[in-house]
Amino acid sequence: MEQHSSEISRLKSGETLVDLAFLANDIVKVNGKILIDAPIECVWKALTDYDHLNKTLPKVVASSIVERKGNEVMLDQTGKTGIFFFEKTVNFRLRLREEYLKKVSFEQVEGDFSVYRGEWILESRDSLKGTILSYHAEIKPLFFAPPILVSFVQWQDMPGILRAHKKTAEALCPVQS
């Protein structure tokens, strides 16, 4: 996945990038990116510490591995979602497929969404110090929530989630000055 130079410049300046799109059938597409000042191994460790995500990620109340078979993980999570007066607890089970140091794909197998699937992608390159962590997902809750509300919640929450992964990865591998 090749980034445009303006996107790379924005990431290097510390921006957290979030992009939203409305798809057919009220599905919201979310893309997010952040540059993390840590080696890809540390970003991987932060991203895949599934049993402790509730300690590092905002709005994740519980997170636990149900089963692991090779590169496939079944993960139960509980989170809080919403804005202003509307806050809801959501529960879901995800099937994760790991490609070591490259990607974690996920799809809900049961829970409070009719559509919840996507991937986390890790990318490093010689011309760039650090690791780019990207998030791509398609989301549609089972409960009533207009797409504009879903998109606003994602736009509001995604930067905090990306920054939390950044903070955790950078704490695991502090940069020596």
Where are these regions (language model features)?
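Hydrophobic pocket/interface hotspot
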Residues: 43-44, 53, 96, 122, ...
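One face of beta-strands
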Residues: 16, 30, 77-79, 88-92, ...
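Residue-level preference for beta-strand/loop junctions
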Residues: 26-28, 71, 88, 114, ...
